[in-house]
Amino acid sequence: LRMTDKLEIWTLDWVPMANGPAGFVRDLRLRWACEEAGIDYDVSTVPLAEKTSEHFSRQPFGQVPFIKDGEIEIFESGACLLHIARKNENLMPGDPVGEAETLQWTIAALNSVEMVSVPWWFLEITGAKENGLTDWLESRLSHIEGILSEREWLVSDRFTVADLLMADVLRVKKVRSFGDRPASEAYIQRVTDRPAFQNAHAAQMAHFQAADATRN
């Protein structure tokens, strides 16, 4: 299959700027990965307000992000990240052990942490009288805190795509402020201080700010 030197990343055409998800929409993960790997990318959009048949043809759940790389089309941010990471050793170690450890921690960020933190966050913001996921989230975050208190990075003593994804999961505002976890906080700060994150975050914010300006 043919791939290209420039990826196409798809995101939403607009999100509310006031108390909205700008800065956290998951195309940021893919922009960030491209910045880390030195891969050029273009951004295309699908409407937030009305899901189109084209959108569902590219992402069967009507979500973002998804990417097009030549003849290859991929949805789900984790799958997209692994595709990008395999293009460059800045994100994925070239040795079998490093690659395996990176894969396991990338999946752990999605399946062991985010699968708890997102429903917990949703119950928090919707004003649920009781959040039955709090103890579960506490357990997951405590395990991560213990690991990060002993190492700077998750894999191979260096930054990988696993750190990109784990930090993006942990930096969600309510999750980040839930409890006192100094090692996790230092980790989030260390990862998000990287120029690639700063560039990707600024690019996403500029995208949504420009879209918002056309509505005012």
Regions found by a protein language model. Name each.
Residues 202-216:
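Terminal-tail/helix-coil boundary detector
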Residues 50, 194, 205-208:
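Intrinsic structural disorder
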Residues 4-5, 97, 106-195, 200-203:
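GST-like fold's C-terminal all-alpha helical module
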Residues 14, 46-48, 158, 202-205:
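Residues that form or immediately flank small-molecule/cofactor binding pockets and catalytic motifs
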Residues 54, 179, 184, 210-212:
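Residue-level signature of transmembrane alpha-helix interfaces in integral membrane proteins
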Residues 1-135, 139, 145:
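GST-like domain detector, emphasizing the conserved glutathione-binding G-site
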